[in-house]
Amino acid sequence: MNDEIRIIPITTKKGLKTFIQFHYDLYRGHKFAIPFLRFDEMNTLDPKKNPAFEFCEAQYFLAVDSEARIVGRIAAIINHRANAQWNKKQVRFGWLDFVDNVAVSCALLRAVEKWGKSRGMNECVGPLGFTDMDREGLLIEGFDRKSTMYINYNYPYYKTHLESYPLYEKDNDWLEYRIRVPKETPAKFAKTAQMIESRYNLHVHKFTRRELTSGGMGRKVFEIVNETYKNLYDFQQLTEKQIDEYVNTYIKKADLNLVTGVVDGNAGNKLVAFGVSFPSFTDALREIGNGKLFPTGWLKVLKVLKWHKTDTVDLLLIGVLPEYRKKGANALIFADLIKQYRRYGFKWAEAMPQMETNTGVQSQWQYLESEQHRRHRCYKKKI
């Protein structure tokens, strides 16, 4: 391949579709990469549809070789709220994909650095999305494991390129665990759940659809997210518009047997913790192949969502208010969810990425048969 690489900024909706399409082309037929839903990608990247653009700005770039072939893509993002909250001047890079050519990866990263520097930024960091609800990190371990729709998958050579590019260094790692659903709820969870119910008057709460939508409980779930995650790596508080978007996108579609709350009977049944799971769409999305729900893809997704045609469940979010962590509220969540997992015949649970320094969360898995099987990394560089 000729190393004459041109970087083209995306300025049209047609260009954005081309930007999105490149990922499908690069990973077509891959055994472990999972095609993302196209409408999710478009809604996230479209400034008119993503509420994060109230405090973010972005520019998307394509890399084109001398034969006019698209050979890479990258998004440059500035999250002004996160920068203000953490007192940083960071430009983020995300949606990074490229062929195995150092000239391409270098040109893409330079484009983001130049764009960020022109806007007063002094550090480049990524892969990151607009917010912490987007996919984060470069896959550096677990290339032989099926991915999920919630995390990045990339070829092993990405890591080689990033670490050979001048001055990029590790900023943060996330670990992911695969957990065998036990045939019986572990005694640790069962006994702790019984104890904290009687000692602290904490109880499992199963939501109704109305509670989560018009009743406002869905908003309370994400208010707990804001409180629980506020001190984690580069987290910024979700806005009301973002919360409404996530309630409509995820909570309204959830199987409520797989959503568990914990309420405090001594505080007027205040919601103090929650866990949200979804059946895994991994195999369904692999069958669809191109990320399109129409004309037939929707049926494959529906079979998973409504009839649980999968052996794996994705544990998307867990949140416990700080003052209830030492009271064991998480034991109530797991005791209930494990029961629901067995009922649906799930054999495996995929825990979403956890910071490697978050040993408190990781310690939960010691009571279950689990394996840390993937690792994602975020890099940073002064510019």
Task: List each model region and its residues.
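Short beta-strand segments
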Residues: 125, 178, 261, 276, ...
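Acyltransferase donor/substrate-recognition loop-hinge adjacent to the catalytic core
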Residues: 2-5, 152-232
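A conserved beta-strand-loop-helix scaffold within acyl/acetyltransferase catalytic domains
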Residues: 23-66, 74-84, 206-318
